[in-house]
Regions:
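Conserved class I S-adenosyl-L-methionine
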Residues: 1-53, 56-60, 77-80, 84, 138-165, ...
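Class I SAM-dependent methyltransferase SAM/SAH-binding core
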Residues: 52-98
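A conserved beta-strand element that flanks and buttresses the S-adenosyl-L-methionine
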Residues: 110
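Acceptor-substrate binding/catalytic loop of class I
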Residues: 170-186
Length: 249
């Protein structure tokens, strides 16, 4: 699949990640609800948002941490982040597998919409475990291969254990960044192997549908989403699963 650590996919002028999120208010708010649900009542010394692009999720973290850092490999996304985030949030260029922090020095790590670029996330999960404080938390979002619609499609065949490339055949080139969905059991085993254990999970973007977004008021979608996230987590229903991880078993 080529060099999956490259940042040039998001450095290219044709890739407008900020623009990508226009019209995706439901998806953003669903992820905001998940972050708030997992972190409400907690306060941290230093939060790091890994692979956070222009800072969409990073911007949610100052109310939970004294110091917030966006660690992003793309120089272009960091330039956009400087305008989007403004002052008060540190921005550094770093790969998820090579974070410039001392072992055990970070008490909150978030990594959202990064796993779908990582066919094998072992190195990145191990790096999160390395920098995470022994009593800290990590929030990792997983693109869920076993979501309800896919389980119906694969009825009788089961869900593959390994990652599945969701790119169209014409876009499957070695010079393109991977886009994969993961088997959640495999990911939780990979996390456990590096010392990260699941404390809680949420099913996110459960109502992601162009039709629903057109006909159902936004506030109603969010009300249902808020109630559905914990309720549907056991079913692994949604296309996105948020995991709250800790180094304590």
């Amino acid at each position: 699949m080529g060099d999956i650590k490259r940042a040039d996919f998001y450095d290219g002028p044709a890739h407008d990640y900020l623009g990508y999120w226009k019209g995706r208010d439901y998806e953003h708010d669903a992820e905001r609800i998940a972050i708030d649900s997992l972190l409400t009542g907690q306060h941290f010394t230093h939060a790091v948002d890994v692979g956070g692009g222009y800072g969409r999720i990073t911007a949610l973290l100052p109310k939970y941490a004294d110091h917030v850092t966006l660690a992003e490999p793309s120089s272009r996304q960091l330039d956009v982040a400087a305008r989007f985030l403004g002052e008060g949030i540190e921005r550094i260029q770093a790969q998820a597998a090579h974070l410039p922090f001392a072992a055990g020095s970070i008490d909150l790590v978030t990594m959202v919409r990064v796993m779908h670029h990582l066919p094998d996330p072992t190195a990145e999960l191990a790096e999160i475990a390395r920098v995470l404080d022994p009593v800290g938390f990590a929030v990792v979002e997983v693109a869920n291969l076993g979501h309800a619609r896919n389980r119906l499609r694969r009825l009788g065949r089961g869900i593959p254990a390994g990652p599945v490339d969701i790119r169209s055949p014409e876009n499957r080139h070695d010079d393109e960044i991977p886009f994969v969905n993961h088997n959640l059991d495999t990911v939780t085993a990979q996390a456990a192997a590096v010392g990260l254990h699941v404390v809680r999970s949420l099913s996110v973007s459960n109502l992601r549908s162009g039709t629903l977004k057109r006909v159902v008021p936004h506030r109603v979608l969010l009300r249902v989403e808020r109630a559905a996230q914990p309720a549907l987590a056991r079913l692994r229903f949604g296309p996105s699963i948020f995991l709250l991880l800790t180094k304590s078993s």
